[in-house]
């Protein structure tokens, strides 16, 4: 593994641990809220469930009763809104963590790639070009550039109203599925953990996408700097051979093009943002 790839992966693992803590806490809070909500129905549930078991109600009638009790009214609306906003808050924290780390990943990969370009250049070419001096950057430099021109590092953002709406819909679906599966009150509360898991999975995916973009963006910046000094640079597409990699990206593994040309799939690099500079 390329040293900078290894370092980037280590940083990603640290970030993923922080994200896991964020959603673990959110899941714990949601579970407590849900259990308190369903607890108020426990006596009535036991009575009506016994009647259902005795044949007083059909399964469909019992499900309708449960939905009227659990999934409608102001108390449920308030709980669902509260839980959805708590999950969106977690997503905002996750986005902030990602935005905090990506400048470091850009700087790390830019500086290492600059070092590799200079190290691998033959003495003859160095004599022809003359002094070779890359501008090494740190994460603070990258952040300052981002403030002046956001396209350099488009930040991860959470569209709050849209995110809350999505979570409310998923929470409603989780409750409905639990009722249709005849879940107990305890299991119904546990259903909402699946929604927390969906948000956690999305955050991990966003982190990996952002890190890959930052990694390749940092390298591309080093190539551009080398080109300005008269160094011919060729970039090489390396694809990870796992299920997270698109088939079209895996097919490009090993393809080489001049650094300022697009690959055969039209991308300048993996995770390329056409509107950005990196």
Short names for language-model regions:
Residues 1-197:
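N-terminal leader/targeting and assembly helices and adjacent pre-domain segments
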Residues 197-198, 202-278:
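Acidic, glycine-rich two-metal-ion catalytic cores of nucleic acid-processing enzymes
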């Amino acid at each position: 593994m390329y040293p900078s790839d290894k370092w980037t992966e280590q940083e990603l693992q640290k970030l993923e641990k922080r994200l896991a803590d964020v959603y673990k806490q959110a899941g714990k809070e949601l579970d407590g809220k849900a259990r308190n909500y369903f607890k108020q129905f426990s006596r009535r549930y036991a009575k009506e469930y016994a009647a259902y078991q005795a044949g007083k109600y059909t399964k469909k009638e019992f499900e309708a009763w449960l939905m009227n009790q659990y999934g409608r009214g102001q108390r449920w609306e308030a709980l669902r809104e509260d839980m959805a906003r708590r999950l969106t808050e977690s997503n905002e924290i996750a986005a902030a963590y990602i935005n905090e780390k990506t400048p470091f990943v850009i700087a790390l990969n830019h500086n290492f790639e600059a070092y590799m370009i200079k190290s691998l250049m033959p003495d003859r070419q160095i004599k022809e070009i003359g002094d070779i001096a890359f501008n090494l950057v740190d994460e603070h430099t990258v952040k300052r550039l981002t403030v002046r021109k956001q396209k350099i590092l488009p930040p991860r953002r959470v569209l709050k109203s849209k995110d809350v709406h999505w979570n409310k819909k998923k929470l409603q679906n989780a409750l409905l599925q639990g009722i249709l599966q005849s879940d107990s009150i305890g299991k119904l509360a546990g259903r909402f953990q699946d929604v927390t898991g969906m948000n956690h999975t999305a955050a991990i995916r966003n982190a990996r996408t952002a890190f890959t973009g930052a990694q390749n963006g940092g390298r591309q910046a080093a190539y551009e700097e080398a080109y300005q000094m008269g160094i011919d640079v060729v970039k090489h597409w390396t694809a990870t051979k796992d299920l997270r990699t698109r088939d079209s990206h895996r097919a490009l593994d090993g393809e080489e093009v001049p650094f300022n040309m697009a690959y055969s799939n039209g991308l300048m690099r993996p995770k390329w943002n056409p509107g950005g500079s990196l």
